[in-house]
């Protein structure tokens, strides 16, 4: 069945800068905000934008991510005509390779896209936190007569050299793309959100297929510069909302803190734009008689007998008597014993922090504890990780 636009979510990245949190799972499957996994945001954006056909391109350690997505029913994507499809690298009669880059991942799945013969294809990163109506971006794409539209967001000038920067004319047309420029001319950073006319993009892939010397493996490094060289009509779509690339431990911690310290920046309670997830069947949270909880997100299944402040606790977390959890992100099913102090830390899934452990914030560095780690009683962790 022909679709006007389908979405392809790039979700195969390892996320090596997240260190211990991606040892066993893909970056888009990392827990966020007490209740969610990172990929929930783009899946919810697709559903809320009226996009009913979504391909999720996985590669690195996909088991938990695949299980989380399932049939897509939690995002209303279990459709007869459309739905969500998990697409992994595969072999055919000629070749079989891992995805070599963002564009190569789409190229390998041309047959899937052709099944729906869309006018447009929406390319998304599965590891960013934001809420966006893609139908508005598509409207912009049509109004401009664009062949390729890239969503951009203004970043602080002193941070612009960390991003792929789009240099634009007054009409928002893009005349130059610079990857992490040392002296940026603009502060419009690419969000990794693209709309392409499918026939045009497909023609580029077919050109590379015929000529082994042509490399279109990556959108930012290869394909977008080539399109600009060919004077393809390319426009920058300005996005004004909250957006964060949670590619590092610091940025992941910052984004979690944003939802408790400035909840208006990323309103998770907005009834008009809900963020859906594959929820766990767990009892309500329990707050003990002598517990003290302030400015925190506490998920279902938590049992709080101590103090929790300025923190995000995922489902199934236990905080024992006399324990304090301050300025921290605690991932699912962590058990914290009695008389424990945890300050400015990120604790991985299913870790056990035994009685009288001290995890202290000394130099304002984030303390990190690996998933499934067992911290022995009376250990002291200062400015570091396990």
Swiss-Prot record:
PANTHER family: GLUCOSE-1-PHOSPHATE ADENYLYLTRANSFERASE, GLUCOSE-1-PHOSPHATE ADENYLYLTRANSFERASE-RELATED. Belongs to the bacterial/plant glucose-1-phosphate adenylyltransferase family. GO terms for molecular function: ATP binding; glucose-1-phosphate adenylyltransferase activity. Pathway: Glycan biosynthesis; glycogen biosynthesis. The gene is glgC. Alpha-D-glucose 1-phosphate binds at residues 99, 164, 179-180, 190. It is an enzyme of class 2 (transferase). It holds the Pfam family NTP_transferase. It comes from the Bacteria. HAMAP family: GlgC (MF_00624). The keyword Cytoplasm does not apply. Its EC number is 2.7.7.27. This is Glucose-1-phosphate adenylyltransferase. Homotetramer. GO terms for biological process: glycogen biosynthetic process. NCBIfam families: glgC, PRK05293.1. Keywords: ATP-binding, Carbohydrate metabolism, Glycogen biosynthesis, Glycogen metabolism, Nucleotide-binding, Nucleotidyltransferase, Transferase. It catalyses: alpha-D-glucose 1-phosphate + ATP + H(+) = ADP-alpha-D-glucose + diphosphate. Involved in the biosynthesis of ADP-glucose, a building block required for the elongation reactions to produce glycogen. Catalyzes the reaction between ATP and alpha-D-glucose 1-phosphate (G1P) to produce pyrophosphate and ADP-Glc. InterPro entries: ADP-Glc_PPase, ADP_Glu_pyroP_CS, GlgC_bac, GlmU/GlgC-like_hexapep, NTP_transferase_dom, Nucleotide-diphossugar_trans, Trimer_LpxA-like_sf.
């Amino acid at each position: 069945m022909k679709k006007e636009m389908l979405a392809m979510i790039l979700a195969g990245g390892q996320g090596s800068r997240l260190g211990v949190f991606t040892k066993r799972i893909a970056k888009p499957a990392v827990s966020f905000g007490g209740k969610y996994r990172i990929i929930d945001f783009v899946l919810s954006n697709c559903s809320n934008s009226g996009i009913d056909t979504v391909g999720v391109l996985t590669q690195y350690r996909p088991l938990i991510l695949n299980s989380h997505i399932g049939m897509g029913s939690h995002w209303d994507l279990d459709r007869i005509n459309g739905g969500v499809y998990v697409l992994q690298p595969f072999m055919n009669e000629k070749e079989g390779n891992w995805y070599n880059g963002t564009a190569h991942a789409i190229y390998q799945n041309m047959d899937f896209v052709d099944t729906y013969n869309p006018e447009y294809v929406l390319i998304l990163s599965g590891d960013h936190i934001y809420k966006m109506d893609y139908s508005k971006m598509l409207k912009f794409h049509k109004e401009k007569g664009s062949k390729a539209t890239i969503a951009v967001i203004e970043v602080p000038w002193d941070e612009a050299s960390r991003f792929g920067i789009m240099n634009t004319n007054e009409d928002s047309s893009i005349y130059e793309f610079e990857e992490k420029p040392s002296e940026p001319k603009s502060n419009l950073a690419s969000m990794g959100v693209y709309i392409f006319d499918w026939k045009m993009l497909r023609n580029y892939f077919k050109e590379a297929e015929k000529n082994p010397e042509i490399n279109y493996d990556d959108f930012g490094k290869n394909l977008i510069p080539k399109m600009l060289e060919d004077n393809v009509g390319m426009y920058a779509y300005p996005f004004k909302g909250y957006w964060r690339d949670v590619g590092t431990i610091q940025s992941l911690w910052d984004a979690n803190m944003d939802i408790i310290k400035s909840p208006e920046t990323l309103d998770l309670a907005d009834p008009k734009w809900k963020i859906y997830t594959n929820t766990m069947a767990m009892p309500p949270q329990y707050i003990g008689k002598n517990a003290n909880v302030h400015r925190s997100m506490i998920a279902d299944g938590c049992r709080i007998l101590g103090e929790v402040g300025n923190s995000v606790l995922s489902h199934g977390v236990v905080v024992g008597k006399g324990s304090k959890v301050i300025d921290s992100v605690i991932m699912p099913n962590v058990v914290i014993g009695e008389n424990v102090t945890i300050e400015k830390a990120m604790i991985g899934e299913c870790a056990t922090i035994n009685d009288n452990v001290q995890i202290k914030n000394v130099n304002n560095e984030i303390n990190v504890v690996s998933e499934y780690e067992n911290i022995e009683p009376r250990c002291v962790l200062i400015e570091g990780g396990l």
